[in-house]
From Swiss-Prot:
Residues 32-196, 206-330, 351-529, 539-685, 824-992, 1001-1143 form the Plastocyanin-like domain. SUPFAM superfamilies: Cupredoxins, Galactose-binding domain-like. Expressed by the venom gland. This is Venom prothrombin activator pseutarin-C non-catalytic subunit.
Length: 1460
């Protein structure tokens, strides 16, 4: 644990930080200054350290030159001692809410580096990140500290960024160097930052409520991208590879806090697993921590089982590469504090479950039935055995359940198709004991290892990578023909939490060699349940139906039986080249329950049933499996979503309500292999009264499995189809002996019999197997066959369909509205159009091997005003940031969305929506759903065709509670989702609470932005020429694609329109519809946020997984321009970043028309009448001619223009007319245009749906009318265009706003916020009737004595302001004064400043490095404004007059902001 010094906070800071009360049970400590002395230094690092005696013999090939953070004593001469476990990690920084962290940083390395935190409150000169944020050189010293230099970073831990009520005591973040994210990380510059609740830390910085805490970083270091390049890829924990991580120590009954960091410069996922243990993360019980590169998690664990346990990432390539270590739990004599005492009633409910499970070898057919709709390329690659491929049948090993320990009578005679390749379902609730008698009937050693429960070493069933042969016990590897009994109890610490589902989804598998055993087929599902979740039969109480779906990738190349399969199924086994990429790929099978293609049978559910899905990802997969449910949504962890992301070797439990008639698809979203292999269709249908009667009769039996009822004729038909379970010749003898097949190898079907009491036992076994039964009303032979029902035509009994009439979208919408009776119809006109899209600029650090093409033909969605599709709906300021995205489709809960879609592109496209409810005729996606032709016209709209989609917004599509305003989804073309999206056809859907959308179809009182994070791969676009695709050689050597563009909303680096006010509620809707490898971790510099609907959890970064739609809420606390980026370094470097600007909420300052700061030459117009020149258009101007005026002629469009000579923020406009000879002239209505360059003009649209917003003008010639500009305009040129007027178009104007860089508010001279005592001078003039004291030097002060005058007029005089604390001063306005008839003002002056009121420094001219002399006033009443570039950072400032008119007289205002 790192050491640091702690100092009390000054009283003023203490008062500022103590505003957060914290949790009641925390002892509130005084806020502290926690000081760290950290250096970046060179170090030779060995990823695979050898024992000392071996390391002397040979130099390791794994030694690399790294730059690392290390903690030092105060003088940076002596390094602080450190824990060997921390490895490459820098010291762990800790702070409680209310604390300030001061990091004294010194760079001992040879490269400029920095320190940047993922979460903290900091100003611009403590950010540690370099980008174009408009700051001055003095504020950029933190960005990159040169070698040999030092810098002091100051970070504050405020209540706004601290852990929320539901968070753990400390949240985990990372700090790292942000000079070059890719090279800095791969060089080793990273450490952990813990932000903790008030009162949660001990004096030494450790946590109070845990016995131990550990930081583990699972990381992939690419040494070829280190500053000191050396080709190598290292998979490590804390920088240790191949199990060389020092053992993590714990005692039995310890409570451990784990702070886990994932890191890689490329997209990476980690499935962190602690063998034999369970954890709690965000109030959910888990056995695997889902971690992505660039993000961190906090979890806790209570341990009780002693022994040495494996810590690893279960991603297949991580296991093979040696990413593992060990947790060593010892018996330290501690009492058992984890097991609670049970009542007598609870003791009586404890159950002992006994399973008899064997491992058997079979021939498995991955696709016993191949529908004609299967993609032909996929079929040729994976299912056919042409080209000397193995095909779709493989020898495998599976788990099979038996009736008893004799292992002679399987629980099912015929292999249940619905179960697929899975072993039997093992279920248990807390305190239950599970006994598994395992017999190995296979030809090699196997075992059973269970996830999600705490087990003892003798019940673990797993061999570790470093286990010597002599340590391999019988339970770890059960030899062929042997029997071993695994026994374990579900502990209190394993029980699902209050937030969890009744039963949480886990898995079991053989773990002799985990990768090869799973590849061979040995997997099964495990359910760990709450204490009241199961009936005595093992059936879940709170669900109508349970369904298991295991998304497994079987890499047959790693199976134990590869050689057997080559010999049996390849046409020429001796010619097979196992390292041939095509052959290898053909053996990687993407399956759902072991099936690698859709099946002809369709899973059946009853309308309104509540289905509990148990979803698991297993196998040789190194990417996320996104599971998409069409026409319905999952309810998981309190959130409705239609895509669930499964990490390798992890499971999710989700509830689905069957509320949408039709045949729908459950499939994996993403790659071609996944979407074709991992899929099944299911039927949501009403059944006849007879079925319903049967269901009611058996209601009390508690069986909750879906319908597999098969009429006898269907069974007979199925007998003609090859059964998927085909015994090997070696297994035939056993099958015959067991009476499972006859002499000819045909399955034996038992005769029909009357249902008996034994059926209940049979049904309980079906439950254990995860089978789907028809409420107990099925005959035994039908139950044992467990074939799926012949699907009914869901549309045949659908009263909505009349096949004799044409589809009428208005009737469909009307029916929806009549059903709900409280919604509105919202109509959109959207077209698909082809455009040329330019990704340029390529970027500041982009390197490409040949001339980079950045302009590509794409298709986009565009909104139109009506069904003629002649007039596009022009986007305004609110749409400026959307980039390539289609128009935002907004609706409220219970609304109906009607979209008339026209395909103006050259190939078929459609519209497919996520999260909404629709009939099959509005799905916009094509698959074999048994729909009538009438319902298939939506699948693909031909070029120039038109179709109307109707989508309903049920409550599940909208916000889950009152704190959430709107929920985000997406729509896209679903003809070929991958290619359509990469072509550009995608847009956002926002579903809001009732009353949140105004008449212009915009959300009320919400600042919202939609960001789509996507790596566009133009080679996957429909429009990419095949001749331009990357060569095979380029792909094989991993050359960065010339045609991929990481971007936000399709725009690398420079997304525009992200402007907001300080402290306002900003809602960000974040989308990721990329493939399984598209992992983005979103970070907003200088800000933290919460996820909508989950405000109890604080976030510093947000992992954005494939198919994710996340709505987050932020209250920006720091003004300025900030970076929004992905934490995945390689994508960030190539363009997945943007800038957002936070404007001061007081950004409504007069910009200088009335005061004269804006010169006459800066005001121009299309023309004027008489003497009414544009330079007169100044608010409250006086005189005979005091405004701009023009006579409007027919077909002329007059305007007046202000050139602000720099980019500024405009937030409001004040206008006046004029009166001459009692005649009023004024503008009644006008619109505004603006420009950055004076050539390209944009019409301000604001909230209006029309092409421009018409501002209400004046009603007479004297009254001032103020209009608010929202969103704010950032521009140099502003034009006002009068459209309606009285007498003549006439204007007197003032623009309101502030500087783009922010920090430009008045500091208090005019307002009086700066006290009189804080204003001093060298002297001041006294007369018998007045004193011209320094405290009078306030801008626009009125009165006879209204300025500062010195006693004498010479160059030694000065006016001084004490700002009381360090302040950033960005500009100054000076003004003279008039005494009697004497006009007095300062013509030139200089500026001096200091922090200590002792050593004064002159403000220098950056061009000459000499003292800068500023030009002052030219009259006594006008204003002159000067900007300090760079700004002044100081407490004291002096204005020193150099020349003056008549006498020295000053009135001033300073502008800037506080440092903190």
């Amino acid at each position: 644990m790192g050491r640091y010094s702690v100092s009390p906070v000054p009283k003023c800071l203490l008062l500022m930080f103590l505003g957060w009360s914290g949790l009641k049970y925390y002892q509130v400590n005084a806020a502290q200054l926690r000081e760290y002395h950290i250096a970046a230094q060179l170090e030779d690092w060995d990823y695979n350290p050898q024992p000392e005696e071996l390391s002397r013999l040979s130099e390791s090939d794994l030694t690399f030159k790294k730059i690392v953070y290390r903690e030092y004593e105060l003088d940076f001469k002596q390094e602080e001692p450190r824990d060997a476990l921390s490895g490459l990690l820098g010291p762990t920084l800790r702070g409680e809410v209310g604390d300030s962290l001061i990091i004294y940083f010194k760079n001992f390395a040879t490269q400029p580096v920095s320190i940047h935190p993922q979460s903290a409150v900091y100003n611009k000169w403590s950010e540690g990140s370099s980008y174009s944020d408009g700051t001055s050189d003095v504020e950029r010293l933190d960005d990159a500290v040169p070698p040999g230099q030092s810098f002091k970073y100051v970070w504050n831990i405020t209540a706004e960024i601290g852990p929320k009520k539901a968070d753990p005591p400390c949240l985990t973040y990372a700090y790292y160097s942000h000079v070059n994210m890719v090279r800095d990380f791969n060089s080793g510059l990273i450490g952990a930052l813990l932000i903790c609740k008030e009162g949660s830390l001990n004096a030494n910085g450790s946590q109070k409520f845990f016995n131990r805490e550990y930081v583990l970083m699972f990381s992939v270091f690419d040494e070829s991208k280190n500053w000191y390049r050396k080709p190598s890829l290292q998979y490590t924990i804390n920088g240790f590879a191949n199990g060389t991580l020092p053992d993590v120590q714990a005692c039995a009954y310890d409570h451990i806090s784990w702070h886990l960091i994932g890191m890689s410069s490329s997209p990476e996922i980690f499935s962190v697993h602690f063998n034999g243990q369970t954890l709690e993360q965000n109030h959910y019980k888990v056995s695997t921590i889902n971690l992505v590169g660039g993000a961190s998690v906090t979890a806790d664990m209570s341990v009780s089982r002693t022994g040495k346990w494996l810590i690893s990432s279960l991603v297949a390539k991580h296991l093979q590469a040696g990413m593992y270590g060990y947790l060593n739990i010892k018996d330290c004599g501690n009492p058992d504090t984890l097991t609670r005492k049970l009542s007598f009633r609870e003791l009586m409910k404890i159950k002992n479950w006994e399973y008899f499970i064997a491992a058997e070898e079979i021939t498995w057919d991955y696709a016993p039935e191949i529908p004609s709709s299967v993609d032909r390329r996929y079929k040729a690659q994976y299912l056919d055995n042409f080209s000397n491929f193995i095909g779709k049948k493989y020898k495998k090993a599976v788990f099979r359940q038996y009736e008893d320990g004799n292992f002679t009578k399987p629980t099912y005679a015929i292999w249940p198709k619905e179960r697929g390749i899975l072993g039997p379902v093992i279920k248990a609730k807390v305190r239950d004991t599970v006994t598994i008698v395992f017999k190995n009937l296979a030809s090699r050693p196997y075992s059973i290892y269970v996830h999600g429960v705490s087990v003892s070493k003798d019940a673990e069933g797993a061999i570790y990578p470093s286990d010597p042969k002599e340590n391999i016990t019988h339970g770890k590897a059960v030899e062929p023909g042997q029997v071993y009994t695994y026994k374990w109890t579900v502990l209190d610490t394993d029980e699902p939490t209050v937030k969890d589902s009744e039963c949480i989804t886990k898995l079991y598998h053989s773990a002799v060699d985990m990768t090869r055993d799973i590849a061979s087929g040995l997997i099964g599902p495990l359910l760990v349940c709450k204490h009241k979740a199961l009936s005595v039969k093992g059936v879940q109480n709170k669900a109508d139906v349970e369904q298991h779906a295991v998304f497994a990738v079987f890499d047959e190349n790693k199976s134990w039986y590869l050689e057997d399969n080559i010999k049996k199924y390849c046409s020429n086994p001796s010619a097979v080249k196992k390292d041939d990429p095509k052959f290898y790929k053909s053996n990687v099978m993407y399956t759902l329950n072991g099936y690698a293609s859709d099946r002809t049978e369709v899973l059946r559910f009853h309308q309104s049933e509540v289905v509990q899905w148990h979803l698991t990802s297993v196998g040789t997969v190194d990417e996320i499996v996104p599971v998409h449910l069409s026409g319905h949504t999952f309810l998981s962890k309190g959130k409705h979503q239609d895509i669930l992301n499964l990490f390798p070797m992890s499971g999710e439990s989700a509830t689905v309500t069957m509320d949408n008639l039709g045949t729908w698809l459950l499939s994996s979203w993403g790659s071609c292999e996944m979407s074709n292999g991992m899929r099944l269709r299911f039927l949501d249908a009403n059944y006849d009264d007879e079925d319903e009667g049967n269901e009611e009769e058996e209601e009390d039996d508690g069986d909750i499995f879906a319908d597999i009822f098969i009429p006898s004729e269907v069974v007979k038909k199925k007998e003609e189809v090859p059964v998927n379970f085909v015994p090997d010749p070696e297994s035939d003898a056993l099958a015959k002996e067991l009476g499972l097949i006859d002499d000819e190898g045909n399955p034996i079907i038992q005769p029909r019999r009357e249902q008996t009491e034994d059926d209940e036992e049979q049904l309980m076994k079906a439950s254990m197997l995860g089978l789907r039964s028809f409420k107990g009303s099925v005959a035994e032979e039908e139950l044992k066959h467990t074939a799926l029902a012949l699907e009914e035509d869901a549309h045949a009994s659908d009263p909505r369909i009349d096949s004799n009439s044409a589809r009428n979208p208005d009737d469909i919408a009307g029916r929806y509205l009549r059903t709900i009776n409280r919604g509105n119809k919202r109509r959109y006109y959207i077209a698909a159009e082809e455009v040329l899209w330019d990704y340029s600029p390529i970027g500041k650090s982009q390197v490409r091997s040949r001339a980079a093409k950045t302009t590509f033909k794409k298709a986009i969605f565009r909104s139109y005003l009506d069904d003629t599709f002649q007039t596009p709906s022009t986007g305004g300021e609110y749409e400026k940031h959307l980039g390539i995205l289609g128009p935002i489709i907004r609706a409220e809960v219970d609304d109906v969305i009607e979209i008339q879609f026209k395909n103006l592109a050259s190939r078929p496209y459609s519209l497919h929506a996520h999260g909404l409810l629709y009939e099959k005729s509005s799905e916009g996606r094509s698959y074999d759903d048994k729909s009538p032709e009438l319902f298939k016209k939506d699948d693909a709209i031909m070029p120039n065709g038109t179709y109307t989609y109707v989508w309903q917004v049920p409550p599940r599509s909208g916000p889950t509670d009152n704190t959430e305003k709107c929920k985000s989804w997406a729509y896209y073309s679903g003809v070929n989702p991958e290619k359509d999206i990469h072509s550009g056809l995608i847009g956002p859907i926002l579903i809001c609470q009732k009353g949140m959308i105004d008449k212009y179809n915009r959300t009320i009182d919400i600042r919202e932005f939609v960001l789509f994070f996507m790596v566009f791969d133009e080679e996957k676009s429909w429009y990419f020429p095949k001749s331009d695709k990357s060569t095979c050689e380029e792909k094989l050597i991993g050359v960065q694609s010339l045609h991929t563009f990481p971007a936000i909303n399709g725009i690398p680096y420079q997304l525009q329109g992200l402007t907001m006010y300080k402290d306002e509620n900003v809602h960000w809707h974040l989308l990721n519809m990329g493939g399984p490898k598209d992992i983005h971790v979103v970070n907003f510099h200088g800000q933290t946020f919460t996820e909508e609907g989950r405000e109890d959890n604080q976030l510093g970064v947000l992992p954005l997984l494939p198919g994710t739609f996340a709505s987050i809420k932020m209250k920006p606390s720091k003004i300025g321009t900030w970076l929004l980026e992905t934490e995945v370094g390689e994508n960030q470097e190539r363009g997945m970043q943007a800038l957002f600007t936070v404007i001061d909420k007081d950004c409504k300052l007069p910009m200088g028309l009335a005061s004269g700061i804006i010169q006459d030459s800066q005001i121009s117009a299309s023309g004027h009448v008489g003497y009414w020149e544009p330079k007169l258009a100044r608010l409250n101007n006086t005189g005979k001619y005091n405004a701009w005026s023009i006579i409007k002629k027919e077909h002329e469009h007059p305007w007046i223009q202000i050139d602000l000579q720099r980019q500024v923020v405009i937030t409001g406009i004040q206008t006046q007319g004029t009166v001459q000879l009692l005649q009023h002239s004024y503008t009644v209505e006008y619109f505004v245009t603006y420009s950055e360059d004076g050539q390209n003009w944009i019409t301000f649209k604001g909230r209006h749906s029309e092409t421009q917003m018409h501002f209400e003008g004046n009603s007479d010639g004297t009254t001032v009318k103020e209009n608010h500009i929202d969103p704010p305009i950032i521009a140099r040129y502003i034009r006002l265009h009068p459209t309606k007027f009285y007498n003549r178009p006439t204007f007197r104007i003032e623009l309101l706003g502030c500087e783009v860089e922010g920090c430009s508010v008045p500091l208090g001279m005019e307002s009086g916020a700066i006290k009189n005592s804080e204003i001093t001078a060298s002297s001041y003039k006294k007369t018998w009737w007045s004193s011209w004291e320094p405290s009078l030097a306030r801008l626009n002060l009125e009165g006879g004595t209204n300025a500062w005058q010195p006693e004498v007029n010479n160059k030694d005089q000065w006016l001084q302001i004490d700002l009381q604390h360090l302040t950033k001063i960005t500009s100054i306005i000076t003004q003279g004064a008039t005494s009697m008839t004497t006009s007095m003002y300062v013509k030139t002056f200089s500026i001096h400043y200091t922090d200590d009121n002792s050593t004064w420094k002159p403000y220098l001219d950056v061009r000459t490095s000499m003292e800068k002399v500023f030009t002052g006033n030219i009259n006594s009443d006008g204003h002159v404004k000067h900007f300090f570039k760079p700004p002044i950072l100081s407490r004291f400032i002096r204005i020193i007059p150099k020349t003056w008119n008549q006498y020295i007289a000053l009135r001033i205002e300073l502008f800037g902001c506080e440092v903190f």
